[in-house]
Amino acid sequence: MKTVVFAYHDMGCLGIEALLAAGYEISAIFTHTDNPGEKAFYGSVARLAAERGIPVYAPDNVNHPLWVERIAQLSPEVIFSFYYRHLICDEILQLAPAGAFNLHGSLLPKYRGRAPLNWVLVNGETETGVTLHRMVKRADAGAIVAQLRVAIAPDDIAITLHHKLCHAARQLLEQTLPAIKHGNILEIAQRENEATCFGRRTPDDSFLEWHKPASVLHNMVRAVADPWPGAFSYVGNQKFTVWSSRVHPHASKAQPGSVISVAPLLIACGDGALEIVTGQAGDGITMQGSQLAQTLGLVQGSRLNSQPACTARRRTRVLILGVNGFIGNHLTERLLREDHYEVYGLDIGSDAISRFLNHPHFHFVEGDISIHSEWIEYHVKKCDVVLPLVAIATPIEYTRNPLRVFELDFEENLRIIRYCVKYRKRIIFPSTSEVYGMCSDKYFDEDHSNLIVGPVNKPRWIYSVSKQLLDRVIWAYGEKEGLQFTLFRPFNWMGPRLDNLNAARIGSSRAITQLILNLVEGSPIKLIDGGKQKRCFTDIRDGIEALYRIIENAGNRCDGEIINIGNPENEASIEELGEMLLASFEKHPLRHHFPPFAGFRVVESSSYYGKGYQDVEHRKPSIRNAHHCLDWEPKIDMQETIDETLDFFLRTVDLTDKPS
């Protein structure tokens, strides 16, 4: 039975082994690259696939239309998901005639969502299990095919329960996979009235709140014990981790968080007391409780606290949806450079923000905005400033996938805008220079230029029109319901991390990244319709500084404003951009690793983008509003931007196979 598998972690490995043992023919396996900030104690699906001679892939977005098409070409009869961390789109699920099945680590419908292993321990459950269920569009909601119950012992911690669940999963799959193969299964619909759902946990969620009962704190310790990050507390500003604990029914009038004794190390709680059996001060070594007390300088009567003693004033909470994108990751870097921002981010990947994942003021959830609506609504309510940066913004997609562009760029963002209205939150919305369309003004002005687009049978305008309509909706909400907003319009921002070379390989990237790929691979640089179209290229650092000032909003000068962010002095045609890039490439110290330049080739836009494409001959911003509202002007010359962007991408290329 031809099978496509989505898998990660130990459960992914055992699921693959079970399929092979049951005689399934695995055509391809999709997995994830390991997160360098995560302690990898589990088996490698990629290594197992390689050892078994099975093609394995780890795309950033498996739901991209090109991956959907590649999976369709495999003609899977059935699909399995074993602890794959991304939701799989309905288009993929519908490819398999026998259906798609997911292995989930709880007794569904209880504990849908993320980290059920940890949540059942946090909540003090005495039973959990594994469930194999049919996959539907909504996460973990499909009919149940099989379940096995697993008892949770009082001394179970996360790793021991993980091993129990793996053992149960092997049994479950051994019993169930033959029945699926022969179409002989009985499915039971989940009872929605019994469903519970839990979100992703982060290390910051595991602080010990001493006013809670000792049993609750002990469960927290069990849930995140090694190899998870551990429960923690503070002595003054000194952080320490509790690796194991015991509950004492100690009757004491001491304030919660007070040290009752140091040998054993006993801490008063809201109800009872918690003995810290083993722990660790800062980044030190693990030690027994009494030695930990000595290391931390604790004596009877000392007080512990859940937060550092000298906590600064509350940071401004900024929600960035699409935080892993070009603007999102650079903006995150700028905000975290200051000491008064807390950044909350959501995206379907994390490669560009991996450098922030361990930052104490950066909180990331991997997910899709079309699915994580409850998480988004909660964080809109929780945060002070919202930046919905998620969009399909590459021209080839406007003609290739116009409906997907509309659904994501318009419909999903409209929902977020309405959350901002509902909870009265400030929104900073990314409009686009594309809204000006075929405007003939010498300088495109936010307040006076007409927004001119082509006919309906030219789908390339669906992005421009979607953004324009959202601009108008936001403006109306500001006028009629008091929404605090700023619209910003980027003009051809470029710099390191603008798309990636893999995106360029499938045509889904902006101009400079595509040109760099041509140089790297020794293929001709394609000049669409001769490359005479002119753009004003803006360095990402200039753009981000302007965006940062919008967030700062000195004197509330940005409220209700539309602000172009571009560099009118950096105007060049695409052909000129290609020539400047080539000159920089020829001088680069890594030049000898790459093939000879293959020349320029003029191609028609219809052959490259499709028949529904129209181009814009020029696009130059007026930056009058940026001067007035932000006291900002761009400073970085285009050549410097080209040099740094090229250098970044060349240093990401694996040079082992390149000629020298």
Swiss-Prot record:
GO biological process, one term: lipid A biosynthetic process
Pathway as given in its UniProt record: Nucleotide-sugar biosynthesis; UDP-4-deoxy-4-formamido-beta-L-arabinose biosynthesis; UDP-4-deoxy-4-formamido-beta-L-arabinose from UDP-alpha-D-glucuronate: step 1/3; Nucleotide-sugar biosynthesis; UDP-4-deoxy-4-formamido-beta-L-arabinose biosynthesis; UDP-4-deoxy-4-formamido-beta-L-arabinose from UDP-alpha-D-glucuronate: step 3/3; Bacterial outer membrane biogenesis; lipopolysaccharide biosynthesis
One GO CC term, this protein: membrane
Region (Formyltransferase ArnAFT): 1-304
Site (described: Raises pKa of active site His): D140
Pfam family, one: Formyl_trans_N
Binding site for NAD(+): D347, D368, I369
Marked site positions, Transition state stabilizer: N102
Binding residues annotated for (6R)-10-formyltetrahydrofolate, in chain numbering: H86, L87, I88, R114, V136, K137, R138, A139, D140
Annotated keywords: Antibiotic resistance, Lipid A biosynthesis, Lipid biosynthesis, Lipid metabolism, Lipopolysaccharide biosynthesis, Multifunctional enzyme, NAD, Oxidoreductase, Transferase
Keyword flag Cytoplasm: no
InterPro entries linked: Arna-like_SDR_e, Bifun_polymyxin_resist_ArnA, Epimerase_deHydtase, Formyl_trans_C, Formyl_transf_N, Formyl_transf_N_sf, Formyl_transferase-like_C_sf, Lipid_A_modif_metabolic_enz
Chain residues that bind UDP-alpha-D-glucuronate: 393, 398, 432-433, 460, 492, 526-535, 613
Residue ranges of the region described as Dehydrogenase ArnADH: 314-660
Documented EC number(s): 2.1.2.13, 1.1.1.305
Active site (catalytic residues): H104, E434, R619
GO terms for MF: carboxy-lyase activity; UDP-4-amino-4-deoxy-L-arabinose formyltransferase activity; UDP-glucuronate dehydrogenase activity
Catalytic function, reaction form: UDP-alpha-D-glucuronate + NAD(+) = UDP-beta-L-threo-pentopyranos-4-ulose + CO2 + NADH; UDP-4-amino-4-deoxy-beta-L-arabinose + (6R)-10-formyltetrahydrofolate = UDP-4-deoxy-4-formamido-beta-L-arabinose + (6S)-5,6,7,8-tetrahydrofolate + H(+)
Superkingdom classification of source: Bacteria
Subunit structure and binding partners: Homohexamer, formed by a dimer of trimers.
Function field: Bifunctional enzyme that catalyzes the oxidative decarboxylation of UDP-glucuronic acid (UDP-GlcUA) to UDP-4-keto-arabinose (UDP-Ara4O) and the addition of a formyl group to UDP-4-amino-4-deoxy-L-arabinose (UDP-L-Ara4N) to form UDP-L-4-formamido-arabinose (UDP-L-Ara4FN). The modified arabinose is attached to lipid A and is required for resistance to polymyxin and cationic antimicrobial peptides.
Family: In the N-terminal section; belongs to the Fmt family. UDP-L-Ara4N formyltransferase subfamily. In the C-terminal section; belongs to the NAD(P)-dependent epimerase/dehydratase family. UDP-glucuronic acid decarboxylase subfamily.
PANTHER family (UniProt xref): BIFUNCTIONAL POLYMYXIN RESISTANCE PROTEIN ARNA, UDP-D-APIOSE_UDP-D-XYLOSE SYNTHASE 2
HAMAP family hit by this protein: ArnA (MF_01166)
Protein name: Bifunctional polymyxin resistance protein ArnA
Species in which this protein is naturally found: Escherichia coli O157:H7
Source species taxonomy: Bacteria, Pseudomonadati, Pseudomonadota, Gammaproteobacteria, Enterobacterales
